[in-house]
């Protein structure tokens, strides 16, 4: 059985969350653990992946966007999306060498974990041909955008629990114009974020065949093997 660590946080500014990811990345790179799953919410932020640009898929003036939320260009795949309170963001920092060096399989498994989670709440979700993420009909409930370096993953998924969906109205989320977004709340499911996080950990353990130990931020200090 693979062994990993899970870190559950509250509402975190985007750049602070990125720094936490980088610390986790270094720990996984040193093979101190097979993977680290970071769970949090972000303060309102729009992020643009490597396929997007500032002039694409933003439906209002940039200055107005920046009044509503932070805006960053980031390393993950995909185009623009929104993160904010009421959304479970999961950053799996996994060494794919411990599984299979197959990015498509990794994304498939991320989707599978969310699909299984939503099924427990009576939400029938699935995949959509030609698109990533998890969908309920023609509306996306969970976005996926990852980056991989040295077969270690970072960035991740964003599941809309009770997110303010009006933020998505200012953009073409993920560059998609013909379909919309939804949330668990919009689908009639009222649930606490912490409960969703706990159940998502369970689904990650099932799908990725890994056992997590819960840690806090102090455990992300990377051991210098030269001094150990």
Curated annotation (Swiss-Prot):
| Keyword Transferase tagged | yes
Occurrences of domain BPL/LPL catalytic (ranges): 31-212
Can you list the GO cellular component terms from the UniProt entry? cytoplasm
What is the reaction catalyzed?
Answer: octanoyl-[ACP] + L-lysyl-[protein] = N(6)-octanoyl-L-lysyl-[protein] + holo-[ACP] + H(+)
Q: Which Pfam families match?
A: LplA-B_cat
GO:BP terms for this protein? protein modification process
Q: Which GO terms describe its molecular function?
A: lipoyl(octanoyl) transferase activity
Sites binding substrate sit at 76-83, 143-145, 156-158
Q: Which residues form the active site?
A: 174 (acyl-thioester intermediate)
Predominant cellular place of this UniProt entry's protein: cytoplasm
Q: Where is the signal peptide?
A: none
> What Enzyme Commission number(s) appear in the record?
2.3.1.181
Q: Where is this site: Lowers pKa of active site Cys?
A: 140
| Pathway assigned in UniProt | Protein modification; protein lipoylation via endogenous pathway; protein N(6)-(lipoyl)lysine from octanoyl-[acyl-carrier-protein]: step 1/2
Other information:
In the reaction, the free carboxyl group of octanoic acid is attached via an amide linkage to the epsilon-amino group of a specific lysine residue of lipoyl domains of lipoate-dependent enzymes.
UniProt-recorded name of the protein: Octanoyltransferase
Specify the taxonomic lineage.
Answer: Bacteria, Bacillati, Bacillota, Clostridia, Thermoanaerobacterales
